[in-house]
Amino acid sequence: MFLLLSNDDGYASAGMRALVEVMEGAVERLIVMAPESNCSGVSHALTLTRPLTVQTHGNAIYSVNGTPADCVRVAVGGYFDEVPDMVISGINCGANLGDDVLYSGTVAAAFEGRYLKFPALAISNVAHRPKHLADTAQIVLDLFSFFKKNPLTGATLLNINIPDLPRAEIRGIRVTRLGQCRQERPLEKMINPRQEECYWIGANKGGFLADEGSDFAAIEQGFVSITPLQFDVTHDDQLEAVKHWLEPMR
């Protein structure tokens, strides 16, 4: 089996190192192709206005001067002599829950794999400074081993969030839907050394709605959250309402 690993934290991130350590012996071929630097929050951006370059870092580890989606696109688009059987993106340091998945480069790398017809997993440890990355990696290995024996279809993309807990303290696995964040991202104004105004987009301070069955609720209760994702973001419930609204314009 040929497994492609990517992420948005960069090829040398702690999460990637932990994942490589456990996955090396689990597959016949393991390749890392990830951004050369941290690309958190870039979502599904593709680089279309300049060429991409690839650097090699030892055995089967490659970096790209582009986005997470670029990395997967390059990896499966002909850079290697074969295409992967699966794409895993992660381990991200920080949660990718609820509607925040729209911003996530981690989820986008997995989405790109899914878009190109490969089963894909997006993996996140919910802590920004995790203490239990090795435990998280072991849980990923457990899930991967199960998926390997019970293959995913090419239409599958799973967003997996794991509490930052010792493996023995994880309560189990919940299949969840995306929850909702209360969006409050303050704009922080600063003055740089050249006395110019500059701005930081602050972290979301609004919290979340931990409705039962949501990914937020599962994490809050100490479970691994697994949410199947898809591309179609059509608001089906509004189709008829919008048609009716536009009748006078026809």
Swiss-Prot record:
It comes from the Bacteria. InterPro entries: SurE, SurE-like_Pase/nucleotidase, SurE-like_sf. It catalyses: a ribonucleoside 5'-phosphate + H2O = a ribonucleoside + phosphate. GO terms for cellular component: cytoplasm. SUPFAM superfamilies: SurE-like. The keyword Lipid metabolism does not apply. It is found in: Cytoplasm. A divalent metal cation binds at residues 8-9, 40, 92. Keywords: Cytoplasm, Hydrolase, Metal-binding, Nucleotide-binding. Binds 1 divalent metal cation per subunit. Pfam families: SurE (PF01975). Its EC number is 3.1.3.5. The keyword Hydrolase applies. One of its GO terms (molecular function) is 3'-nucleotidase activity. Its cofactor is a divalent metal cation. Its main location: cytoplasm. Nucleotidase that shows phosphatase activity on nucleoside 5'-monophosphates. Belongs to the SurE nucleotidase family. HAMAP family: SurE. This is 5'-nucleotidase SurE.
